[in-house]
Amino acid sequence: MSSSIDPADQAAPADFNRLLRANLQRVFNERDPGLRAAAIAELYVADPIMYEPDAVIEGREAISAVAGKLLDQFGADFRFTPEADGIGHHHVGTLRWHAGNPSTPHMVTGTDVAEIVDGRIARLWVLLNPTG
């Protein structure tokens, strides 16, 4: 086992919890397209990629469109809620979450896995838990 440290890992560590919670709150719970776009510009690299179970979404505008469509599809009181603190190391962070409305708060559950580059999300994998 090597004891050498990659110089890229010596930079200040990413705040995985802050970044991944901000993504959930300010992107995937934000109904205002302008505010959502501003959050994406702050939280994501210039050319991010998001991987969903059946789609690959490329670019900030496309990610914003997916978030907006989800919110529109499930109604005004649908929201994503973190289940624990975001954790990570070596440029990869995770955040467990559930989503739903007040009467059915766990309509869907999953985990976001993000590759962090220079303190921003470069790639995001949305892993959904099986239902039933």
Which positions does each model-derived feature cover?
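C-terminal and inter-domain tail/linker signature
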Residues: 1-132
